[in-house]
């Protein structure tokens, strides 16, 4: 055990990541006693209506652990500083910036990325969302070599997790957080020790998970019930799948497919009860249990039954 811990301590790591999931990787590096000499994360950005500056999860952890951190607009800006650190490797997780070859060539071992999918499936910035939206039954994380082409490097190892029908992107993120921690804690050192041979990705099986756009968030009731429910699951809790009711945006949450069918046009509200709103689709109705109308708080359908709600039987959602 002593030799393994020492081998970690002797490896200088620069970690690059920004959101919460990346803190699980950084914590695992620290738990494993890697010498994390610096952290690189995205610049602070104003958030919400008040435009408050809120530190990213990784920046907060770097401050807490007293680790030097950088926040360049483009990583090229700190090329000299990174060279001076003389790192053994870069480790990245949800960093959010393109890393050019001039930076990738700095560390002795190169750059290892923790990617939240089972590559070659779902290359890109939103693999967890798209796994749920597309109704996948499993996903995972892998350790891969970073090259110039996005998420196209050789894969060293992976860990899998099941996606339940009840999972949303929010609940799946929690599972993936733990998986990220486990793969860094248990497998990264083996990658550095050349115990895992790199495996080339099968280019014939590549798919992409581009960042979610506003168009992706819009519900199309001409699709079937399962597809719509998966979209709602895949965009919960944020950014939320939406439609329009009387020209107002309405987000839908906690939806399930039913066995009932109506002859009404897709998007029609067929029934409202304490169980939820029953809405027509291309095939079976869906039951939606929570909504958020533009300008109002998110609420359970049972709490709006007695109000003067715009949600009425016969209304068609667009």
UniProtKB/Swiss-Prot annotation:
E.C. code: 2.1.2.9
Cellular compartments per GO CC: cytosol
Group of enzyme by EC: transferase
Binding site for (6S)-5,6,7,8-tetrahydrofolate: 117-120
Record-level Gene Ontology MF annotations: methionyl-tRNA formyltransferase activity
Pfam families: Formyl_trans_C, Formyl_trans_N
PROSITE patterns: GART
Catalyzed chemical reaction(s): L-methionyl-tRNA(fMet) + (6R)-10-formyltetrahydrofolate = N-formyl-L-methionyl-tRNA(fMet) + (6S)-5,6,7,8-tetrahydrofolate + H(+)
Domain of life: Bacteria
HAMAP family in the record: Formyl_trans
Family statement drawn from the similarity comment of this UniProt entry: Belongs to the Fmt family.
Protein name: Methionyl-tRNA formyltransferase
Organism, scientific name: Malacoplasma penetrans (strain HF-2)
Taxonomic classification: Bacteria, Bacillati, Mycoplasmatota, Mycoplasmoidales, Mycoplasmoidaceae
Gene, per the UniProt record: fmt
């Amino acid at each position: 055990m002593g030799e393994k811990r020492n081998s970690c301590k002797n490896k200088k790591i620069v970690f690059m990541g920004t959101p919460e999931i990346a803190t699980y990787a950084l914590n695992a590096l620290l738990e494993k006693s890697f010498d994390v000499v610096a952290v690189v994360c995205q610049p602070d950005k104003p958030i919400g209506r008040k435009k408050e500056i809120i530190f990213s999860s990784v920046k907060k952890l770097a401050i807490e652990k007293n680790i030097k951190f950088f926040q360049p607009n483009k990583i090229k800006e700190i090329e000299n500083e990174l060279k001076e650190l003389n790192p053994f490797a870069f480790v990245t997780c949800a960093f959010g910036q393109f890393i050019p070859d001039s930076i990738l060539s700095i560390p002795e071992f190169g750059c290892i990325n923790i990617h939240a999918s089972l590559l070659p499936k779902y290359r890109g910035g939103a693999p967890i969302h798209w796994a749920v939206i597309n109704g996948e039954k499993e996903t995972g994380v892998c350790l891969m070599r970073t090259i110039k082409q996005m998420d196209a490097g050789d894969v060293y190892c992976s860990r899998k997790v099941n996606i339940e029908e009840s999972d949303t992107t929010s609940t799946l993120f929690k599972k993936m957080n733990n998986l990220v921690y486990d793969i860094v804690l248990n497998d990264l050192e083996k990658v550095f020790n050349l115990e895992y041979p790199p495996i080339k990705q099968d280019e014939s099986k590549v798919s992409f998970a581009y960042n979610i756009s506003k168009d992706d968030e819009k519900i199309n009731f001409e699709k079937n019930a399962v597809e719509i429910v998966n979209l709602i699951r895949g965009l919960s809790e944020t950014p939320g799948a939406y439609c329009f009711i009387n020209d107002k945006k309405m987000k839908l949450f906690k939806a399930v497919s039913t066995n009932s069918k109506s002859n009404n046009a897709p998007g029609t509200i067929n029934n409202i009860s304490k169980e939820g709103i029953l809405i027509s689709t291309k095939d079976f109705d869906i039951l939606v249990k929570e909504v958020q109308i533009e300008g109002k708080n998110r609420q359970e359908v049972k709490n709006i039954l007695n109000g003067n709600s715009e949600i009425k039987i016969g209304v068609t959602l667009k």
